[in-house]
Amino acid sequence: FIPSAYRSRIICIPRLCSSSITRSSMEVSGYCIRLLGIEFGYALYEAEITVEDVDPILAVENIRDYASVYVDGRLQGWITDNQKNIKLTVSTGTHHLQLYAENIGRITYGPEILDNSKGLFGSITLEDVEIENWKMTPLLIRDCDVEELQFTPCQTKQSPCFYRGTFEIETPTDIFLDTSGWGMGEVWINGQYIGSFWENISQRTIPVPAAILAKGINRVVVFELKNNCRQVVRLSEKAIFD
């Protein structure tokens, strides 16, 4: 089935959707997500940048674990612990920079367990000039009530967003949701959170227990961080691995 082309961009959530997804933003000089009072999930980092030369290099000193990079609402790419810099395809002038960071998990062994900070921390530079005056906002994606989200038609494919769709079944049974082709995010069925997906791992399906399914129409909400614009989700009778 294909989720309807109705999306709710994160930047519009406070106005369009449940306020439970965001907490108050804060101006910070440090960048760990624990400063926001959260230990897991997503955080949005925002700053105004001045570009003096086209295609500047954005670099971060430390990141755990992953962040999507947007400039003026357009996806530029991703930064990770293994790839800490990215060339921005932008013109000269003033632009709005957004970094959507996620804590994928926690280390449970080894020396790094003593300092397992998450988010972006240390210096963040544009062409070796440190970016200041950051605003951080916790995004309580997994804790939100997706049944309260208000969707509006949107044709552009830019910022991270929620998709919604429906499928129909005759008899509820244990099945799997195939997220092949999607980038990174979370899924709910009938308002119940069922799990996350990431294109970088071999698992392509999320188990769906019969207990949360209904005979007839069932509702699906997908949060997509990387916005691969896939828009197609399939049901499967078995787990799928690459």
Model-predicted segments: where are they?
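Carbohydrate-binding surfaces of carbohydrate-active enzymes
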Residues: F1-N133, C144-L149, L225-N227
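Compositionally biased low-complexity segments at domain edges in trafficked proteins
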Residues: E127-E170
